[in-house]
Amino acid sequence: MTAPTADAPPPGLRMPGRRGTELALLAGAVLISVCGYIDVGLARQNAVPGDAASYGAGLAALALLGHLAVRFRAPYADPLLLPIAILLNGLGLLLIFRLDLETPADRASPTQLVWSALGVGLFAVVVLLLRDHRTLQRYAYVSVAAGLALMVVPIFFPAVNGAKIWIRVAGFSFQPGEFAKILLTVFFAAYLAANRSALAHTGKRMWKLQFPAGRVLGPVVAVWLVSVGVLVLERDLGTSLLFFGVFVVLLYVATGRTGWIAVGLLLAAAGAAAVGVLEPHVHSRVADWLHPFASITAGRGASQLAQSLFAFAAGGLLGTGLGEGHSALIGFAMKSDFILATYGEELGLTGLTALFLLYALLVARGFRAGLALRDPFGRLLAVGLASLLAVQVFVIAGGVMGLIPLTGMAMPFLAQGGSSVVTNWVIVALLVRVSDSARRPLPDAAATGVIAGPGGARSGASAPPYEEDDLPYGYGYGYGGGGGGGDGGSPGDPPDGRDAGHAPHGRSAPDTPDSSDDHDDQGSRR
């Protein structure tokens, strides 16, 4: 009997109905979005919107496209990731359509639907073409170079609403920083995975914190400082805060040292205080946050933040109903930065709770997929991408609710913004790919030629016909950093000390009594 598959169910029973569950959830997500679309039309125009059928058909086609890509290339992926993304995207489209009724001359929902289609198309391309997420590890330095280049380019373009984050060419505009955040996350994950042992165990100890050696931590800190510096020059402090949060999370996951969280919070507070004093654009936002009702007292009317707070208060527990709010009073950026205020007013605390649970579930499944892997790069990549979504939701929701200063970022999938929705779909595609690797069942030991002897060690007169890198991803003997190396991905390490008794992907093998220990115990009792 072979150890890895002794208790495994037959191959046909390992993943019962996973894609069927996903398809059913997708149908529910499309149905909820279409019903909300119709509800808005009935509330505002006393009639079903004329394009409701085409809207539903388009959203269903996008959901089906994503489902087919996952079914054929990532059959073991988490069945919740794609439906949650489709539901969030559908809710965003119906909210933008609802706000378009307030500004008929400036309709944004058709354009947003096109961007959503492009995002789902890229989702399918990534899932179909990226067969192994470890491929990205080979292009770590290409990723950081491309990411920094994308962040530098907007400096040479005019500022829009006080920030230099846009590139406008022939009426077409996009935010390159949205794509840069994925590229820099790939670099951070690859670099920290390759150097995690040195980061965790070398360096000087100060107070109760052990700091890594400068030669190890220096390159990644330099890249982070450059990226944050560029963002400060562009006055895009929301994205700089996002990079900082993700960097601290990845550093903690790579080293396992909680002290980095404390250091990160202290540095964030110091940096925010310094920039808030030195940068007028940021200083005004901090002043609005500290005194949101000052403009009312001065007789200038309510500020955007004050109107946002009034909208949340008007929503109460159950909301005013879709299409029954007064979000137009927010004015500028009601479809982007302040779209959450519309959601809170019309669906209330109950709707907000459901929305935040969707985001929490999406982030949690991303973390789960990463932590189920024994590949350090895959683990850090999934955690980093999920953290991008988590920090972004916190920064935006905290800003419009008055918990922190406004940052001008876009709520994932919900707010108007083509660059944002496309980037978020790529993030979900990468999480789907990592999830498929983490959930893929074990191969048959007879097929791989790996025969387990006593204690889980390999035995046999001849070597197995497959090397570790020849097996499907996750079927190796230890941490697969892309070259069969252990603990950091350095090649050439022997497999003897790689936790041979553990199943791949972080799934622990069942505890079995050691016969030699039993004999020793019996002898001592005699």
Task: Please place each PLM-identified region on the residue numbering.
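Long, low-complexity, intrinsically disordered segments
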Residues: 466-526
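Transmembrane alpha-helix boundary/anchor motif
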Residues: 64-68, 187, 273, 277-281, ...
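Hydrophobic, glycine- and aromatic-enriched re-entrant/interface helices and adjoining loop segments
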Residues: 160-166, 170-173, 260-355, 374-381
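Loop-to-helix entry and N-terminal half of a specific, functionally important transmembrane alpha helix
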Residues: 367-408, 414
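Interfacial segments of multi-pass membrane proteins
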Residues: 241-260, 326-351, 409-422
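Hydrophobic alpha-helical segments of polytopic membrane proteins
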Residues: 214-277
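Hydrophobic alpha-helical transmembrane segments
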Residues: 57-62, 116-122, 345-364
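Membrane-helix boundary/helix-loop-helix interface segments in multi-pass membrane proteins
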Residues: 7-59, 64-234, 397-411, 416, ...
